[in-house]
UniProtKB/Swiss-Prot annotation:
This is Chitin synthase 4. It catalyses: [(1->4)-N-acetyl-beta-D-glucosaminyl](n) + UDP-N-acetyl-alpha-D-glucosamine = [(1->4)-N-acetyl-beta-D-glucosaminyl](n+1) + UDP + H(+). Its main location: membrane. Residues 176-196 have a biased composition (Basic residues). One of its GO terms (biological process) is chitin biosynthetic process. Keywords: Cell membrane, Glycoprotein, Glycosyltransferase, Membrane, Transferase, Transmembrane, Transmembrane helix, Virulence. The lineage of its organism: Eukaryota, Fungi, Dikarya, Ascomycota, Pezizomycotina. It is a multi-pass membrane protein. GO terms for molecular function: chitin synthase activity. Residues 1-108, 136-199, 595-662, 1201-1222 are annotated as: Disordered.
Amino acid sequence: MSLPERPGGISSEHRNAYRQSQSRRHRPADIEASSYYPVEGGRSSRHQPGLSANSFAETIPSPNNSFVENMPLSPTGERPAAPDQPFQRKRSLIRPERNRIDKDHPNYHYRKHAANMSTMPSATGNDPIAEDIEATTDVSGSRSQTLDGVSDTSPPRGHGSRPNSGEQEKKAPRSSAKRVSRHKSGKITKSTKKRSTPQEVIRPPSFWNVYCAIITFWCPDFMLKCFGMRSRAEQRAWREKMGLISLILLIMGCVGFITFGFTAVVCGSPPLRMRVNKVSDGYMIFHGTAYDLTRSGHPPAEGIPVPRGQRGANILWGMPGVDNRGKDGSFLFQNVNGRCKGLIEAAPNSEVPTNANGDLAWYFPCTTFNQDGKSEPNFTTPYYTGYSCHTSEKSRNAFYIDLKKSADVYFTWDDIKNSSRNLIVYSGNVLDLDLLHWFDSRQVTIPQRFEELRDTNTAANKAFRGRDVTRPFQSNGDKEIAECFEEIIKVGSIDTVTVGCIASRVVLYVFLALILSVVGSRFVLALIFQWFISRNYAAAKTSQSSDKRKRNQQIEDWSNDIYQAPARITGDIGSSVVTSDRSSKRGSTFMTTSRFSTVYGPDRGSSNKRVPTTMASSGGSGSQLLHPNSMYRQGNDSRSSFLRSDPYASNVPPSDGPGPAGFIHEAVVPQPPADWMPYGFPLAHTICLVTAYSEGAMGIRTTFDSIATTDYPNSHKVIIAICDGIIKGHGEEMATPDYVLAMMKDQTMAPEDVQPFSYVAVASGSKRHNMAKVYCGFYDYGAKSAIPVDKQQRVPMMLVVKCGTPDEATKSKPGNRGKRDSQIILMSFLQKIMFDERMTELEYEMFNGLWKVTGISPDFYECVLMVDADTKVFPDSLTHMLSAMVKDPEIMGLCGETKIANKRDSWVSAIQVFEYFISHHLAKSFESVFGGVTCLPGCFCMYRIKAPKGAQNYWVPILANPDVVEHYSENVVDTLHKKNLLLLGEDRYLSTLMLRTFPKRKQVFVPQAVCKTTVPDTFMVLLSQRRRWINSTIHNLMELVLVRDLCGTFCFSMQFIVFVELMGTLVLPAAIAFTFYVVIMSIVSKPVQVIPLILLALILGLPAVLIVITAHSWSYLVWMMIYLFSLPVWNFVLPVYAFWKFDDFSWGDTRKTAGETTKKAGLEYEGEFDSSKITMKRWAEFERERRSKANYWGSKENVVGGGNSWSMPPGHQYHDDYYSDA
């Protein structure tokens, strides 16, 4: 894979400046999707990192490149030697060219950019290896779809002598003579529009669409039309919503079945069981089963009178002279003539009745005995022989048929092994061998084996007593005897668990262990991150207090009011940081500085510690942000130029020509040396992006004040505000862009002279064409600012106002395309700078505007801080965030903690305080250990634009990566899944895209970076906000769960955590319902379900432990209690409402504008996109055209800055005291 070059590096490849997006192949009229072919004799652009001094391949000869051409704007050409060591790729088991790269590959679009670069011939004379470009890059198969008049062309260029130039002229692109520039093409003709219309391709319905159709078969389209869903898009969204709800209900049902139903199915309802010796007096035992005889009545018999008024005497306590309560009456109803037939026979002269078949009437004396086995044999017979033996058919039917058993009597193994009992276990039945002593030898004869087993002194008895004899009895021929014993001496059953109950317990404990491991690991790893890992990201020193507890208290006090200023507002970076260093208590007695010392402090370059790489430090000397021969040079090519008293002294009079250097603002903040590190790390240039919609003046002012007064040097930060249309907030006097424009001063151009420029918006239909104005200047704190005048720093600022096309000037919300479009304006701009691609007029103006107010090329910016217009940043937050970015190049995105400023406004805002706290310090801290924070809040986060790669001055795009920009700028949003991703949760989707594209890089949470914001204080606004957040969370987790390259493996992976989080989000309503059920059942029923209660206590109690251990404010314990009482709202009301509103893509009541009742989704755009209205050229072509219009084709001095002809006026100073101690 080709890598963009870092300034000062080599460029081994070149490319054709066109993009062919697979995701946009169905949009042939898309100006950005159309191919670009240079005319004959033209040269393909270079694969450079951007439009820095070393990357203007069309304009400036770069002495660090291997192949340099003579450019029309540069009459000189240099060819220095290339670096000795080329970039070496890491070893891999799979060769990169053998990887299958399809449209689903995370680096698909980036590989296309790399594959589209043409390779220049080698200087050795060897012919390059020609590859089939058509086969490798034209994935969509529509390369010839470029419209005449749509693809812009470069004018013919002159070339110096180089190998095979004649062959290249012969291989010029076909039909290049027919292509004309866009400004000459005019409007697109009808035939052209007809050819550009994408043909509808009939595809078979997907499985998901079929499933949704089956689920909603009962509601045909005409019924949906009756309920207001007239368009097919609305009907399809509703059907997909019902399909998703059905899956959610199915998942909830599965969770409920596993929680409550699985045990009942596989284990069943076990019968009532009673342990031996604990059978109550209301029961009587027969053959190991207890019967409730409290309401029994014995029919009249000899010796058993019938009490008056009753049907019979009670068997338990009504028998004369006998108390049967809790006793064993197995001998009263003996199982005879079964499996014991042939083993037990009548003795000679026996009184036991028998018949011709040898059947006996009874075996034992018909009496009762104690359940503890301590009764002695009793052979006395009252009244008559066979008394109480119940041998009649009526009495036996009354027992075996009519009497219902109440409970099983069970023995534990401790009972079996009791030395006072003579018990064995066979097939789960407990047999009492002592009952064999009740055989009357005068009445029956028994086998010798019976006598061996009952005698405790025999070897057989000692071998089997207290054990399970199932296997030995079945193997040694005693099976017949054992089965006989089961009928006559069974006293109960062993305490065993069925296979189904064992399985249910295994499942229960597996899920319990899983939940406990997830909850416990989240808690432990969150603590590890808070205590050990997070401190590595923070800056060593800032303008705020270094004491952690004191700083936390300052932050809590600061976050109580949205408009409250911090305890300490940082002033000039030179004074705030250097002074704090010199005021150290351990100061040296001897002088450490002199009048010759640099104002930037001690030299950091003498340290042997490896310094992290930044764009400014990668140039070698560390101080040259501009190329010595750059047309942007200011006469300050060395580090000493910052300290000269008259750095712009020149014998040549200044020029007021139209070159970019002639328009650099006189008050631009100077650039310090790259080795100046006031916070202990190299400074990286960053863009502070503020997206505004309908915010008021007060909210915008405090946001800009907080960013402008951050202690990060102003030379390395710039504020870019993008207003999403001409929108007037509800109750506001002016439109939001007017408020922002009033907060700028020293503008490079009068506001009334600023013209709108076209760009390609993220929309569909005619809305795809949009226009915006670019205002450049410096931030104006205002006359009544709360910031002291001596603390007001000069911060460069650029305002982009999306004003819309003239056709929508009279419509509501002109220029409004959404927050995602605002972000794409910057992301696409950064991508085109890094790859030196064709850009729109708006992007060209943005480039020049940034140059004018910062004095450096935009490709030097490495990070983007994204802040909403209602968010206030703590003074040292930006420093901590950039410290993490610089110290760990693998970090591609991070976020800070968001505090709530209106905690006590209402109960709605109060219940959100602790929810915000645990979402950061528990969830994001845990995810940061894996480097996979799944959601970087759009109100306060930072992304890396590009990252250093290797040690050969190479940079790879991160946020500016074509795959990220291409997917994030998707405008064909035709499914419910895409609409929830791109219309409701664009900020979270950007985090998902970054993780999906770069699964091996990190997204972390930096707790030292803090901001504050206002949250909804009415329930309807909260309901609308959380509907969007919950739905976007579900669909983003669906995307992330498919990424297999995230950190970890199987259950110990980030992918598994994402899956658990997805399932947990889907079953929130069922979970809270189950929780209340378990609590209520534990109160009203016995026995108490201990395990679920312990689990519930752990889940709800661990956050409180986190508060105590991490030493946060004790007030959060109160906020936690408020949060616990509001759990039904969080886990039931909000998710259920969000699920039912899956097909609602509006923003509801979150942020209304003047004259608006409810925010619409804004999905259906009419009209066709006319790409001829948008001009796209490379920067050099725009610059050449601008200069040609100005008729400024001067001498060599005017082109390359010879003689400092483009220097600033002699009176302009570089403000050396800006970084001094004064």
